[in-house]
Amino acid sequence: MKFIDEARIEAIAGNGGNGSASFRREKFVPFGGPDGGDGGRGGSVFAQADRNINTLIDFRYAKKHVARNGENGRGSDCYGAAGEDVTLRMPVGTLISDMDTGEVIADLTEHGQLVCLAEGGMGGWGNLHFKSSTNRAPRQQVDGKPGERRMLKLELKVLADVGLLGMPNAGKSTFISHVSNARPKVADYPFTTLHPNLGVVRVDHEQSFVVADIPGLIEGAAEGAGLGHQFLRHLQRTGLLLHIVDIAPFDENVDPVAEAKAIVNELKKYDETLYDKPRWLVLNKLDVVPEEERAARVKDFVKRYKWKGPVFHISALTGEGCRELVYAIKDHLAALKAEEAAALAEPDIRLDDRLHNVDRDDSKA
């Protein structure tokens, strides 16, 4: 299936049905009172997150989604039927925003999450509501309200804990296929990966994390060159970026340090927030380097790159160094979750001070 991670749709809710202005007319009851029923509410358009869907391709071609109108009220106190709702199933990780106002309507982050995109109009009142002691035969009724109509932008940002960053052919797909259950296409030419791949890395029976592999970046990606710029948004939800570098390129004219710097520059141009995320350097393809030269090669790269953060050297092909990297990632993610939990549990000191001041003022009074 083709991977589509952006779409534009129109959601049109149903109009409410009109209220009825009718009177009871039966044999031997020539002047019965009002019996006009209310109109039914219009159908609404909902979005629901579904973990079994991983692309927005259905919305690339079906752009207009219309809910039914509510039925009009009728005599004999008959209320109009409500219009049928429309529920659109979308991938988990879809961000929905209003194209006219720019407002973010919803961020579907959990399976089953249900959000109203366009609300149906309320049904109008029948003349039964207007009966009073002074107006026994009201002829007024209320028309139904129109339903909402919205132009919406859908953006899919995959939910992953770790994102892989690097030049084409750096070995990202080989790495994710070695450590996870993902089976991306792997070949010895650039741009083998054409869309994001997700892999679940199981550390043990109870612990796992999700890795996202996006197409490789090239210089000028932030301005639209290559493929990777289209998919950088999929790294925005991650808690850690792995910058994978081919430390032993076949072309001797290629400088791995220059390529690594180019990737980081593209990242900064695209999104400062993404640039500021925790990032680890992973030097890949050490199996190609003679064992006696590896330490010197790594040391030289780190020195010329002026890198101060964590460094890992692996061979994604043979698996050398991958286990240590996986366990380091697990510990890092666990620490992040612990920090988030502590931040949520931390009391609001300012609120406590305000409450204390209120109590003190009350005691003075």
Curated annotation (Swiss-Prot):
OBG-type G domain boundaries: 160-334
EC number: 3.6.5.-
InterPro entries according to UniProt: G_OBG (IPR031167), GTP-bd (IPR006073), GTP-bd_Obg/CgtA (IPR014100), GTP1-OBG_CS (IPR006074), GTP1_OBG_dom (IPR006169), GTP1_OBG_dom_sf (IPR036726), OBG_GTPase (IPR045086), P-loop_NTPase (IPR027417)
Keywords: Cytoplasm, GTP-binding, Hydrolase, Magnesium, Metal-binding, Nucleotide-binding
Compartments (UniProt record): Cytoplasm
Known cofactor(s): Mg(2+)
Residues engaged in binding GTP: 166-173, 191-195, 213-216, 284-287, 315-317
Annotated Mg(2+) binding sites: S173, T193
Domain Obg span(s) in chain numbering: 1-159
A GO biological-process term: ribosome biogenesis
Main location: cytoplasm
Gene Ontology molecular function: GTP binding; GTPase activity; magnesium ion binding
Enzyme class (EC, first level): hydrolase
GO cellular component: cytoplasm
Family as reported in the entry's similarity comment: Belongs to the TRAFAC class OBG-HflX-like GTPase superfamily. OBG GTPase family.
NCBIfam families: Obg_CgtA, PRK12296.1, PRK12297.1, PRK12299.1
PANTHER family assigned to the protein according to its UniProt record, in alphabetical order: DEVELOPMENTALLY REGULATED GTP-BINDING PROTEIN-RELATED, MITOCHONDRIAL RIBOSOME-ASSOCIATED GTPASE 2
Subunit structure: Monomer.
Protein function: An essential GTPase which binds GTP, GDP and possibly (p)ppGpp with moderate affinity, with high nucleotide exchange rates and a fairly low GTP hydrolysis rate. Plays a role in control of the cell cycle, stress response, ribosome biogenesis and in those bacteria that undergo differentiation, in morphogenesis control.
Protein's recorded name: GTPase Obg
Species name: Cupriavidus metallidurans (strain ATCC 43123 / DSM 2839 / NBRC 102507 / CH34)
